[in-house]
Design a protein with these regions (language model features):
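Histidine-rich, glycine-flanked metal-binding segment
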Residues: 1-57
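Divalent metal-coordination and catalytic microenvironments
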Residues: 11, 31, 53, 64, ...
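Divalent-metal coordination cores built from histidine and acidic residues
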Residues: 65, 76-159, 171-178, 252
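Short, small-residue-enriched loops and turns at beta-alpha junctions
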Residues: 69-71, 123-126, 130, 158-161, ...
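Conserved beta-strand positions
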Residues: 94, 154-157, 182, 211-214, ...
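Active-site neighborhoods of metal-dependent hydrolases
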Residues: 145, 150-151, 208, 213-280
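Divalent metal-binding pocket/active-site signature
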Residues: 150-206, 220-224, 259-262
Length: 280
């Protein structure tokens, strides 16, 4: 009588937490790992997979994905959910999409991945245009949480708020128990090293924030690239108890290239990249 539901055989089992790194068999019962041994009899399992030459790792947690509104391409929702599952992620946080788009995508193409989302703050769409009072900011954050979001996403490189508004969004979300992710940049700074330099002032002594893709602010637009990297690392090291961050690993990355009526790009992100390639 088989003891296990599934046996994954001959894979290189890697687990950073326990320090395991060896070729082993992994036996699974009721969706949970039952045994990890150098060799397990295939006859003891209902099914088996030979994964020789491949890695067997715990599911990854990706804290910065876009699987909600980004799935609008082709009018098909949920494509990103399939992609993150194929990449080995089991838990992801969508940094900037509507809960409606998220739930529609899960219903259409859910891949079994655990998904949480942050409400994105876009003037004229999810927040009022113009300057925002403290009461309005509290209402915006509260509405995002009530809709099912884990918190909010500040897209400073695309839709910047004033430094005071940015700081107040962060502190309000902190006080309401919401998660805050921040693509750096305000009306006074850009999506560059200067925006990152502003973070300690925005947080004060108690603010907490997730700084999105920190390497995006180290492209060499203010200092040489290596100098910007060193300064960025110094900034987040000094804010170790208040800040978490991550990097985007692909060389190309998505940006919003929308222009005004005169052909000028609207997003600071795109403007920075064009200037670095000597475009005017």
């Amino acid at each position: 009588m088989p003891n296990y539901d599934l046996l994954i055989r001959n894979g290189r089992v890697i687990d950073a937490e326990s320090g395991v790194d060896r070729v082993s068999d992994v036996a699974i019962t009721n969706g949970k790992i039952d045994q990890i041994k150098p060799e397990i009899d295939p006859a003891t399992a209902n099914d088996s997979l030979n994964v020789e030459g491949q890695w067997v790792i715990p599911g990854m947690i990706d804290t910065h994905v876009h699987v909600a509104n980004a799935a609008d391409f082709g009018r098909v929702r949920g494509l990103g959910l399939q992609m993150v599952a194929a990449a080995g992620a089991t838990t992801v946080i969508d940094l900037g999409g509507s809960m409606e788009a998220m739930t529609t995508g899960i219903a259409a193409r859910g891949s079994g991945v655990n998904v949480g989302g942050l409400g994105y703050l876009k003037p004229g769409e999810t927040v009022p245009e113009g300057r925002l009072s403290p009461d309005v900011i509290t209402e915006i954050v509260g509405s995002a949480l009530e809709a099912g979001s884990l918190g909010i996403k500040l897209w400073g490189g695309y839709y910047p708020f004033t430094p005071d508004e940015t700081s107040r969004f962060i502190s309000t979300a902190n006080n309401l128990g919401g998660y805050v992710a921040y693509h750096v940049g305000t009306t006074e700074t850009g999506s560059r090293l200067d925006g990152l330099r502003e973070v300690p002032v925005l947080l004060g002594n108690t603010g907490r924030v997730h700084i999105a893709h920190i390497n995006a602010y180290c492209r060499g637009s203010i200092l040489p690239v290596e100098d910007e990297i060193q300064e960025a690392l110094q900034i987040i090291s000094e804010l170790r108890d208040q800040v978490v961050s991550e990097v985007h690993l692909a060389r190309p990355n998505f940006t919003l290239g929308k222009c005004d009526e005169e052909g000028n790009v609207l997003a600071d992100v795109v403007s920075n990249c064009l200037k670095l390639r000597d475009y005017e």
